[in-house]
Amino acid sequence: NYDNAYPILKKYGFKGTVFVVTSFLGTRKGYLTWDGCREMEKNGMTVASHTVDHKSMTDLTDDQLRAELVESKKKAEAELGHEVKYMAYPTGAYNLHIAQLVREAGYKAAFTIKYGGVSRKSNIYALERVPIFHTEKTNRDFVERIHYTPQFESFGWTKH
């Protein structure tokens, strides 16, 4: 994210969100660091939680879930100096009980890996996204999304 996507987003004035696994930051060469997170935030990016260890949440006990959610949020808030409002489910695995624990941990919303849009009726703890996957059509998909952004905005489908 920091080496590839961030410079392009910064160059063109786009904003984005990076979901961080707090125990991974700065642990290996090439991994994002907290300094990198702070720099990205200064340039309009949002840093959000992806738990402590990126474990599939449906495999964890309630105590383990709470630890993953709360400790990740606390660590990110301490490093960034502000509230961390959002999280993304590792591997996309969640259920309504897990979503409730996310809410109880203090997050304002959570993101799935399900492909789709968001409306006022969407469950804010199970928000769908429109990903850009690395495929032979990645560049074309990205260019089309940029090209059609004005139309999406006119329908109220985007917010920045």
Descriptions of predicted regions:
Residues 1-4, 42, 59-160:
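C-terminal active-site subregion of NodB/CE4 polysaccharide deacetylases
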Residues 1-43:
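Active-site beta->alpha N-cap acidic-glycine motif
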Residues 14-18, 52-53, 76-80:
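A short alpha-helix capping/helix-coil boundary motif
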Residues 18-22, 49-51, 88-91, 129-131:
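A cross-domain feature marking catalytic cores of carbohydrate-active enzymes
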Residues 23-27, 56, 90-93:
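Short histidine/acidic/glycine/proline-rich micro-motifs that form metal-
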Residues 37-41, 48, 74:
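Append "and occasionally in soluble cytosolic enzymes with long acidic Gly/Pro-rich linkers
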Residues 48-63:
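Substrate-binding clefts and substrate-entry loops adjacent to catalytic sites
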